[in-house]
Regions:
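Serine-dependent carboxylesterase/thioesterase catalytic core
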Residues: 2-97, 116, 121
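C-terminal catalytic-base region of ester-bond hydrolases, centering on the histidine
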Residues: 95-169
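A short, charged, and often flexible helix/loop element on the N-terminal side
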Residues: 1-2, 140
Length: 169
């Protein structure tokens, strides 16, 4: 993720273009989800059917905004996130179903950066993950990092990729 958002979206587009098959699904965690959204907007591929965003700050990032204002810490936010925050939201083509998975276990950067709205996953607030184009969303009791290793999250991602909706109980 050392490249900018546009470069990362282009690289993902080239990877998708080189991938065989009629149906392609994407899963992106945090900035990876923003790269997937940027790719969909810039390089739409009709084979991309479903996308799951895990803890992606679609509506902005309080933690990143604080880091960007703090001398010496701006680099921690990363170029892709800095570009996402600075650019207008790209319109998304309607061919892909989008699911948003957020966490509500507040462990991480948000514990030392004041003002992160609750509920949050310790890095991104649930409110920041929302995306109007999403067909479904779910919040699970995991932190930003835990969602990568959580069996429950994996099951929910699989459910969305299979059916276009999460398992709400």
């Amino acid at each position: 993720m050392g490249q900018g958002l546009q470069q990362n979206a282009g690289a993902l587009s080239r990877f998708v273009a080189a991938t065989g098959g009629d149906n392609i699904h994407l899963v992106g965690h945090s900035l990876g989800g923003l790269v997937a959204l940027s790719m969909l907007a810039q390089y739409p591929d009709p084979r991309v059917r479903r996308v799951v965003l895990m803890g992606s700050p679609c509506m902005g990032s309080h933690c990143a905004a604080v880091l960007l204002r703090t001398p010496g810490l701006a680099a921690l936010a990363g170029r892709s996130l800095k570009e996402w925050l600075a650019l207008p939201r790209p319109p998304l083509p309607g061919q892909a179903e989008i699911g948003v998975l957020s966490g509500s276990r507040s462990l991480g950067l948000g514990r030392i950066i004041p003002g992160l709205p609750h509920p949050n996953d310790g890095v991104v607030s649930v409110m920041e993950t929302r995306l109007p184009e999403a067909g479904d969303s779910i919040t699970l009791p995991v932190s930003h990092a835990e969602m990568l290793l959580s069996r429950t999250c994996a099951d929910q991602v699989a459910a969305f990729l299979e059916s276009g909706s999460f398992k709400h109980e």
